[in-house]
Amino acid sequence: MMQRDEPAAGSLYLVGTPIGHLGDLSPRAQALLRAVDVIACEDTRHSGQLLNNLQARGRRLSFHQHNTRTRLPQLMASLADGLSVAVISDAGLPGISDPGEELAAAAHLAEHPVICIPGPCAATAALVSSGLPSGRFCFEGFLPTRGKERSRRLEQIAKEERTTVLYEAPHRLLNLLEELPVSYTHLTLPTIMPV
C-alpha cells in the first residue's frame, strides 16, 4: 500500500475520534489533526479539549446539522483554495449519524480527494460486544423522535431478520424499550455498553 504525505492540499479527511477512551485515537489521526489547515467539529467546545491536548493548529469551525447549509460552501471553498480540511464528530466516525455525509458527497463531486482516517464506531463496537449475530446486520441510525414516522420505522425494523443496530439518546432509551411492538418476539437485548 502506498502512503502519501498527509495532509494533502485540497483534501478532505473524515477522522474517527474516541467514543469513550482517549487512547483510541490512532497515531495517524493525531498527526493529521495537528497538521490540517481547517478542522470542522460537530461541537467546537466538546472537541476543544481533544484538539488542545494534541496542540492542533488548524482553524476550528463548528459543523453540525443546524449550520450545514452555511458551512458546506465555506468548507468547499477551503478545499478549492488548496487547504486541507478534517471533519470530526463528537465521538466516532463523522458521517455515521453525524455531520460529514453531505460534505463528503460534495467533495467527491468537485473531485477533491476524500480520505477516511479510521477510528472507533459506536455501532460496530456495540454489535461485536453484544454477542448477537454480526455476520450480516442492519444499521438504522437515529429513529425519528416521535409520531407516526417513528412508529412506522419501528414496525419496519420488527420485520428485519438481521441483527439491527440503532442509536437512541440516553434520555429516550427507556421510552424506546416501552415502545417496541409486541411483534418483537425474537428481540434479544444485550447488556448496554457504556461509552
Task: Label each PLM-derived region with a short phrase.
Residues 159-183:
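Conserved anion/nucleotide-ligand pocket segment
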Residues 1-65:
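Glycine-rich, flexible N-terminal cofactor/catalytic loop recognition
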Residues 75-114, 121:
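Glycine/small-residue-rich loop that forms an oxyanion/phosphate-binding "nest" at active or ligand-binding sites
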Residues 33-39, 112-115, 163-164:
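Short active-site oxyanion
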Residues 19-20, 90-94, 170-172:
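Short glycine-rich anion-binding loops that position phosphate/pyrophosphate groups of nucleotides
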Residues 185-191:
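Conserved small/polar residues in nucleotide/adenosyl-binding loops
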Residues 102-160:
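Class I SAM-dependent methyltransferase SAM-binding "motif I" and its flanking Rossmann-like core
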